[in-house]
Amino acid sequence: MAKEIKFSEDARSKMLKGVDKLANTVKSTIGPKGRNVVLEQSYGSPTITNDGVTIAKATDLEDHFENMGAKLVSEVASKTNDIAGDGTTTATVLTQAIVNEGMKNVTAGANPVGIRRGIELATKAAVDALHEMSHTVESKSDIAQVASISSANEEVGKLIADAMEKVGNDGVITIEESKGIDTSLDVVEGMQFDRGYLSQYMVTDNDKMEADLDNPYILLTDKKISNIQEVLPLLQSIVQQGRPLLIIADDVDGEALPTLVLNKIRGTFNVVAVKAPGFGDRRKAMLQDIATLTGATVITDDLGLQLKDTTVEQLGSAGKVTVTKENTTIVEGAGDKDKIAERVEQIKKQISETTSDFDREKLQERLAKLSGGVAVIKVGAATETELKERKYRIEDALNATRAAVEEGFVPGGGTALVNVIGKVAALEEEGDVQTGINIVKRALEEPVRQIAENAGLEGSVIVEKLKEQKPGVGFNAATNEWVDMVEAGIVDPTKVTRSALQNAASVSALLLTTEAVVADKPEPESNNQMPATPGMGGMM
């Protein structure tokens, strides 16, 4: 396909139009009085959202050059979302402000490379200042405040705070759709994996169709148990001690399964067999997680261990195990606390090093199961459209909360960005580098200005008043009052604010140093319409 090339001012102005079109759409959603955006779907009802990254990803412009500008803004939103999980609208607003000011100066003859250097210096100074003013998350109420602001809903804030209190900061919190209209929280304590009993005759509670084992031994192996003779000596030792047994193996079949069932029915001893969770290398890792949690040794050829030689000392144990048709839950594993902590750190390291989103998700699930449990927020709503919108809000709030736990929080509502302007203004450089610093200084005001304008006020007036206030005091656009933002519970995670600024500055600087843009040349539409057939009386 033929290409079309635009240079210098012509190229930058086209891309700037794309930046403005997308940013103007996204920035209408910022703040407590921000509006929603309706997105057309290829099928089903439209999506109504105020989530910046969702809007950015759904936007494609007709003009190829404008679309490239829009896609660069979309990249800022996506990157911020990947790192911090929230702050995508703030990142978009900052990008537009830096690009617009920068373009004016480049058009007037400033050197874009010098401007880029100034933007980088100013961004570093601002980020350092944000870290200095950051507050550590110390209580459940801090978590609730962060989540409430992000979701614009106090109930959601309390729900997320409850979830994090129950499963810990490293715990897995998943979001599912509820069948009703209410939003609720379910917590699964202990380690749960999606494998159920191999025979329904192993249940101990016929009403609930589940097997409850109190203080059981746990046999872990990656082998298939087909011959009962392989485990007979071990079973005899367990029968003598009168304790139940949970077998987690690659599979239990052949004569072994009916023999175990028969002994269970006769009351010889209480036993439940389940298949090991996962597949391949992930199965080995999960078996080792269970072994660490319960104090067991995995009977595997990798360690040169055989089932026939297994002793009671190689078994794990737990306070309680519940097995249903679909899930197995191990509570109060008897593993060594130091070894569990060591295993947790090992998984955290793997999470930080992996580049695959799928692997990261699976590692986080394993981490949560070792750390104490899984919480499920079941989102309810009256309509499907409202349900989607509410899910987006809760996902953002959850991500923001995790970010706050990680790096702390700063005064919200754009206040922190205005508060760091002093540190940026203290930088003294020459020429175009100083111009770049001034561009960032001006851009830091933009989120507050936009929040005020979305609330129907004059943004510049609010910004000037904010500069007169003491640090930490900001404008509450929901009530039109000046308050101490932290005391009022209006806070943003430091990681979210930092990531928004860094990503906006990075892409903006690249855009300003662009000298040529190459795009596909649109092909002329071929006129393949069939000519009207004569004699049809004009019925075309």
From Swiss-Prot:
ATP binds at residues 29-32, 86-90, 413, 476-478, 492. This is Chaperonin GroEL. GO terms for biological process: protein refolding. It is found in: Cytoplasm. Signal peptide: none annotated. Its EC number is 5.6.1.7. Residues 520-540 are annotated as: Disordered. One of its GO terms (cellular component) is cytoplasm. Keywords: ATP-binding, Chaperone, Cytoplasm, Isomerase, Nucleotide-binding. The keyword Manganese does not apply.
